[in-house]
Amino acid sequence: VLIIAVLFLAASELVTADYTRDEWQYRAASLRDAMRNFRDTRCSPGGEVCTRHSPCCTGFLCNHIGGMCHH
């Protein structure tokens, strides 16, 4: 009976640890996506002016000489 109890507790710990790791991975992915979305809401699209406070949207580069976003 004692061996069964120890095995049950060990299995419970493994399941809980696995669930917690998955939950943290999900939260990390959600935070990463939220940060991407936040950056893209304040970005300048192609052909628009880019500054330090308004960088180019994902996929565009800022030409700092002219201050315009381009591919």
Swiss-Prot record:
Expressed by the venom duct. GO terms for molecular function: ion channel inhibitor activity; toxin activity. Disulfide bonds join C43-C57, C50-C62, C56-C69. The keyword Disulfide bond applies. Residues 18-42 form a propeptide. Pfam families: Conotoxin. One of its GO terms (cellular component) is extracellular region. InterPro entries: Conotoxin. It is found in: Secreted. Residues 1-17 form the signal peptide. Keywords: Disulfide bond, Knottin, Secreted, Signal, Toxin. Belongs to the conotoxin O1 superfamily. The presence of a 'disulfide through disulfide knot' structurally defines this protein as a knottin. This is Conotoxin LvVIIB. The lineage of its organism: Eukaryota, Metazoa, Spiralia, Lophotrochozoa, Mollusca.
